[in-house]
């Protein structure tokens, strides 16, 4: 579903969503999985609007997802082509206006970053590592729950947990770097 190249032989599936599959005319070949996931409901919304199910005033408001799309795009370290840059810019605009899920706001607080002046640095080096650390050292669903919860108290609790896991990851990483240096010096 993203910027990774599909295998030479594709699985037997009803639907394969990948901008890199043969015959796909997608202009943004480096779109992250979160961007593909965001584009799917956008396309469905457009089709339903065309069929008269709703109009522009009554259609689902998908822009509320842009802060998560921006975070995922930066944290996935994809090339910031025009499409990805636009998604990140729109997501950052909402974050700076404090129009974001409470879990994202809690992650800003737990990481000591300021949402009103958020940059891609915050996504790539403060929030993203906290979410990813849970998947490496604990349970990846902690990060997902933090981003998706509507309960501010639960979001705060999860963000603090994620921050603690990330601190543990940094200690482990530092120990590994120190061990590698000792091995390198002994050669």
What residue ranges belong to the model's regions?
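Hydrophobic helix-and-loop "lid/oligomerization" segment in the mid-to-C-terminal part
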Residues: 46-187
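Short, glycine/polar-rich helix-capping loops at beta-to-alpha or helix-loop-helix junctions
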Residues: 3-12
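Amphipathic alpha-helical transducer elements in NTP-driven molecular machines
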Residues: 10, 31-34, 38, 85-89, ...
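Active-site flanking residues adjacent to catalytic metal/cofactor-binding acidic residues
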Residues: 1-3, 75
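Short alpha-helices
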Residues: 12-54, 62-74
């Amino acid at each position: 579903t993203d910027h990774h190249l599909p295998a030479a032989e594709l699985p037997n599936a009803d639907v394969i969503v990948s901008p890199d599959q043969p015959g796909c005319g997608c202009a943004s070949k480096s779109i992250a999985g979160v961007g593909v996931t965001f584009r799917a409901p956008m396309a469905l919304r457009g089709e339903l609007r065309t069929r008269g199910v709703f109009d522009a005033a009554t259609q689902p408001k998908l822009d509320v997802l842009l802060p998560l799309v921006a975070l995922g795009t930066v944290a996935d370290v994809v090339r910031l082509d025009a499409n990805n840059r636009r998604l990140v810019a729109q997501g950052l605009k909402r974050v700076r206006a404090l129009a974001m899920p409470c879990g994202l706001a809690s992650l800003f607080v737990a990481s000591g970053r300021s949402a009103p002046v958020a940059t891609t640095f915050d996504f790539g080096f403060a929030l993203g590592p906290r979410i990813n650390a849970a998947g490496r050292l604990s349970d990846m669903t902690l990060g997902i729950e933090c981003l998706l919860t509507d309960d501010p108290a639960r979001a705060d609790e999860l963000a603090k947990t994620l921050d603690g896991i990330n601190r543990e990851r940094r200690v482990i990483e530092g120990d590994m770097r120190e061990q590698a240096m000792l091995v390198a010096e002994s050669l």
